[in-house]
């Protein structure tokens, strides 16, 4: 596999917000232009605050995607939180604009799914995309997700979104 998923601890998240070059040095990897934009800095800040309050959620938070050759932080994503009472966990992912179109999102999202199903509490994985065919919908389709509906919630999203689901594989 070309992409490694690195779970972010509080120090990773602080460096992503305040000093991306220090984060790159810590991981021995380059940070491509456009990866850590202002919209993500706010997410990293809130993820760090939540992690400091609840350290037990470490593996269910933000992750960085590391391309092994050349060694570069190619994206970010992770989970929206630990599995809920119904055994559902939600994933999200983003790849640096300069590295899109190479299958990296499929690899990273696939690894997030594999890691989620390694926890016996997880019954299915959820994802959301814009309500139109796009690169993200193709990633989910390649991984076996199925579209289960459309969500319209102007308070959360200005545009409609599609909901996707991937059930835990049945044992052979």
What name fits each language-model region?
Residues 1-90, 95-98, 114-115, 119, ...:
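GNAT-family acyltransferases
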Residues 93-95, 101-116, 138-142:
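Conserved acetyl-CoA-binding loop-helix of GNAT-fold acetyltransferases
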Residues 125-129:
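Conserved hydrophobic beta-strand within the GNAT/NAT acetyltransferase core sheet
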Residues 135:
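Conserved SAM/SAH-binding loop-helix junction
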């Amino acid at each position: 596999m070309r992409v490694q998923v690195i779970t972010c601890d509080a120090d990773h998240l602080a460096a992503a917000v305040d000093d991306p070059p220090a984060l790159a040095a810590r991981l021995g990897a380059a940070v491509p232009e456009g990866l850590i934009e202002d919209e993500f800095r706010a997410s990293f800040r809130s993820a760090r605050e939540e992690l400091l309050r609840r350290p037990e959620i470490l593996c269910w938070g933000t992750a960085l995607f590391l391309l092994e050759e050349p060694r570069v932080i190619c994206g970010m994503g992770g989970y929206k939180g630990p599995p809920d009472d119904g055994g559902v966990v939600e994933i999200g992912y983003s790849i640096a604009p300069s590295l899109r179109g190479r299958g990296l999102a499929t690899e990273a999202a696939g690894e997030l799914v594999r890691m989620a199903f390694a926890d016996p509490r997880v019954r299915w994985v959820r994802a959301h995309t814009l309500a139109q065919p796009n690169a993200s919908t193709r990633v989910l389709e390649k991984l076996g997700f199925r579209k289960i509906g459309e969500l319209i919630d102007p308070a959360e999203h200005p545009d409609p979104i599609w909901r996707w689901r991937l059930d835990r594989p049945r044992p052979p």
